[in-house]
Amino acid sequence: MARENTNKHYWLRKLKKGTASVAVALSVLGAGLVVNTNEVSAAVTRGTINDPQRAKEALDKYELENHDLKTKNEGLKTENEGLKTENEGLKTENEGLKTEKKEHEAENDKLKQQRDTLSTQKETLEREVQNTQYNNETLKIKNGDLTKELNKTRQELANKQQESKENEKALNELLEKTVKDKIAKEQENKETIGTLKKILDETVKDKIAKEQENKETIGTLKKILDETVKDKLAKEQKSKQNIGALKQELAKKDEANKISDASRKGLRRDLDASREAKKQLEAEHQKLEEQNKISEASRKGLRRDLDASREAKKQLEAEQQKLEEQNKISEASRKGLRRDLDASREAKKQVEKALEEANSKLAALEKLNKELEESKKLTEKEKAELQAKLEAEAKALKEQLAKQAEELAKLRAGKASDSQTPDTKPGNKAVPGKGQAPQAGTKPNQNKAPMKETKRQLPSTGETANPFFTAAALTVMATAGVAAVVKRKEEN
């Protein structure tokens, strides 16, 4: 702004100075027209002496043209100032539009980044949805397999439970039967053992009684034998006659002793047999006890089998409960996956909605960018129209200058033709703008002073005139000013 104000004041100073305006006119139109300005002015002044009416008309015409040019110049200045102000406004608006465009471009880039991010998130969510669907299908397949396996396990468990019940029932029946048999056999063995013990005790008692009797008999026999021996010894002398009888009796006694020995041996054999029978009974009793232990061990094994079957039943029930819990967990997982799938679908819908909003915002921004571009093109178009208008006005001014140059050339030609006629009297001064006719009888040598005076007066007001501010000079200055404005606009 400071530079433009400086340039404006600079050109105003140049327009105020006649020499500078003539220099500008020389640079624009050429040196020929401006160099001859004084000569034209002088020619016009000399022409007025020869033909005052034509000079008056020419001066009036130049005054009107000068007035029109001044008016046009003022209008052009005003319009130039307005155009400058409008140009400044357009520049400010253009800067604002550029700033707004940059902001919109930044927002557009941000929205593009958001769109790319949303697209990436959308692709990620689509992949997650696909993975979730794949996992859901896999879980459905696994759930179907687990359901089939669960049904199969339930069927097997039911079969095992039925089989376990049947086995348990059979084992219970077998155990009860075995226990009853063992108890019956044990009772029978106990009764047999009791009977055998009674028989053994009775046999032992009988054997002991018989042995005691045999001992008593042997003692008695020994006593008898001793008494007999004593008697025999005492009566040996006395009973020598009865030796044969005694020998016979001794033989009988020996035979009785042998019989007693045989009886004693038989008793020993019976005792040994009873002891053997007792050992056999004890062995049989031990065998029965071992069988009882075996039956007890079998009963314990059956009890263990029963406990194992019950434990297996409990394990099967626990497995069934575990499978039911796994089924519940899988059902809950399936429901969770369904919820996750619904949530992912909802998120996908939201992402698509956000993407649509972003696309709509992006479209609005693109539309706004297009409008900005169009407005920019429109301002450039208005600027071009303004420049074309200024160039057209400058061209019109140049055409007017050309016309004035032609008229000046005609005036010069008229001056050349008038120089052949007699001069007017020098005593009568021609005052331009008042319509005074020159007096007759003037001498040719008296026309230098009026020429100097008319050079210093304006045609209409009679004021002292600057030769540089003639109509041609003003036209040249106006044209130069317009050309300078156009040039500055082009540079801007």
From Swiss-Prot:
Keywords from the UniProt entry: Cell wall, Coiled coil, Peptidoglycan-anchor, Phagocytosis, Repeat, Secreted, Signal, Virulence
Record PTM Pentaglycyl murein peptidoglycan amidated threonine, positions in chain: T461
Topology term for the membrane: Peptidoglycan-anchor
Renumbered residue ranges of the record's region 5 X 7 AA tandem repeats of L-K-T-K-N-E-G: 69-103
Secretion signal span: 1-42
C repeat positions: 251-285, 286-320, 321-355
Propeptide: 462-492
GO CC field: extracellular region
Sequence repeats: 69-75, 76-82, 83-89, 90-96, 97-103
Compositional bias of kind Basic and acidic residues: 71-115, 249-354
Location relative to the cell: Secreted, Cell wall
GO biological process entries: phagocytosis
Extent of motif LPXTG sorting signal: 458-462
Per-repeat ranges for D: 388-393, 394-399, 402-407, 409-414
Family the UniProt entry places it in: Belongs to the M protein family.
Role, per record: This protein is one of the different antigenic serotypes of protein M. Protein M is closely associated with virulence of the bacterium and can render the organism resistant to phagocytosis.
This protein's name: M protein, serotype 5
